[in-house]
Structures are given as C-alpha cells and as structure tokens.
A protein has these predicted regions:
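Elongated, amphipathic alpha-helical interaction scaffolds
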Residues: 1-199
C-alpha cells in the first residue's frame, strides 16, 4: 500500500522532534493544506479537495523563510528563503509557506500557515493580531525583487496568513484581518476592491 506524505509525517512524530516541528510537518501535507485553503480562503471555498490540491505550488517551505526585513526576499523570483531578521532582534520564521494558484484567473497567492500554541498576550508579551499584521505586511513588502521589479507595483501578489491557534475553545472560529480602504472625504475616484485585494 502506498503511504501518503501525511502517513509518513505522523509516523515521524515519534517524540524525537519538538511539538512545534511535528505540527509544521503535519500542516505541510498537501491534503491538509487543501482543506485549509477550502475552509479559510474565500477564493478556494467552492473547490473540491482535488481541485484545491491542484492549486498548491510545487514548493512547500517548512520553517525555511524568515519574516524579518532583509531576509524574506533573498533569492530570485523562485527563491525559497523563509527567514527575515533585524540585527539585535532575532529572526522570525514562517511555519509553512507556499504559493497557491487560481490558474483559470492567472492569480498567484502567497500563503503562510502558522501553528500558534498560545494567543494569550500575557504569555506572548504582545497581541497576536499585531504579529499577524507584521507577517502579512512582510509578505507584501518582500515581493519587491522577487515578484516584481522597480516600481511595477501592479504585479504585487495577494497574501494570506492562516493562524491555527491551539488554545481556542472547542467550537473554533475563523476571523479575517484585512486591509480595507474607505473614503474619508470627497468623491469616489474609482478604487476597486479587486485592485487592492492583497490581504
């Protein structure tokens, strides 16, 4: 019988590696990622499991790309470095990063899946929502020189961050944090949601 990646990942979680590493490898399974895409990202909501799996790019990075400035966009357009760091601040590493493609629409979405043990700001020392905004912002700003060059900002790709929080209540929920424009003064000058739908 042919074993799936998920079956191998579950077997590999024998206590030799840390809880954090185990969760990352389980989350990186294509079937698990397809399920996450369907239930957490609007663009994939009407897809079957097979359709969603077909949208997942070939490279799934596990704990390999940093979120901090200066490191997240290393490499070429197909670069896979997943680290970002600022001197004296340590390095923030994305748990699972991959690209998802809506092929018929020609859309590429950069996806980050994070396993978060605690959401308690007292334990973390910060509010988790602020870290989420930081990671999403870095996924946008790190696209320069990897997804586009010079001032070709129309080639920015959408980014999505899915944070799976382990300390939630039994019912669970999905909350969306995004960038929403709103007119404060004057006439509408034609900003369309689809032109600014990056987060």
């Amino acid at each position: 019988m042919l074993k799936t990646y998920l079956a191998h990942a579950i077997e590999a979680t024998d206590g030799a590696s840390t809880y954090d590493e185990n969760v990352k490898y389980l989350l990186a399974d294509r079937q698990v990622l397809a399920y996450i895409l369907i239930y957490a990202i609007t663009e994939f909501r009407d897809m079957t499991m097979d359709q969603a799996m077909d949208c997942i790019g070939d490279e799934i990075e596990i704990g390999a790309r940093a979120a901090d400035p200066g490191l997240s966009n290393l490499g070429s357009i197909r670069g896979t470095n997943t680290e970002d760091s600022v001197p004296g601040e340590g390095t923030n590493i994305y748990d699972v990063r991959f690209n998802a493609y809506l092929k018929k629409d020609g859309i590429k979405i950069l996806v980050d899946v994070e396993a978060q043990k605690s959401t308690d700001s007292g334990k973390l020392g910060y509010h988790l929502e602020n870290r989420i905004v930081f990671y999403l912002s870095r996924m946008i700003s790190a696209q320069k020189l990897t997804e586009f060059f010079h001032s070709d900002y129309d080639n920015l790709k959408r980014v999505r961050g899915i944070w799976i929080c382990m300390d939630g209540d039994d019912e669970g929920f999905i909350e969306e944090i995004g960038l929403d424009g709103k007119r404060i003064l004057g006439d509408d000058y034609g900003i369309r949601r689809e032109d600014t739908d990056y987060v």
